[in-house]
Amino acid sequence: AAIMVETVMGEGGIKVIPPWCLRELRKICTKKKILLILDEVQCGIGRSGKFFAFEHANVKPDIVPIAKGIGGGFPLAAVLMTKKVAKGMIPGTHGSTFGGNPLAMSIGSAVLEQIFKKGFLKNVQNISKYFNSELNKIKKGFPYIIKEVRGVGLLIGLQLFKDQTKFIQKLMDNKLLTIRAAENTIRLLPPLTVKKQEIDLAIKIIKKVCNSF
């Protein structure tokens, strides 16, 4: 038996599971002797400003699926687990057609080397705080368009009052790519190497689109 949740709901509208909730889930799973699985496919590998998003809650899951960020754009995924859980994963119980691809492994290694460079995650934290601050300024200026700015690190959601599809299309027309999520939310997922001037350009475009409604 297990409880499985996304540490940050991606498709669900960029909703961060509160740290207290993750800690309570850990207590429940430990008490009931069931596994806690935290899905970090979208929010892991530095996206939140920490290597794993669950680190913000100071909890330790039993199993962690990861993908996307670990490959830096190349198809790569993994399932991480504690030594205790891994004892049950004997050969044949878990496999992958493309698992162990030498090119993917090399790329994953290069990604980790970059992520763990001194100051890299701190820069993600700093640039994300700046981005969030600027987005909230836009929200304050256009309260009839933007309902909420939410997320963690460089995994940011803008929940809109206006039509999501039109907003995304107008951003695209101005050369800013975003993606939809649930509850009329658009996702802003810049690369972890994004620079301040690129954030400023994105903010300028979002303001321009807000002014067009």
PLM feature spans:
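Conserved N-terminal phosphate-binding loop of PLP-dependent enzymes in the Aspartate aminotransferase
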Residues: 1-213
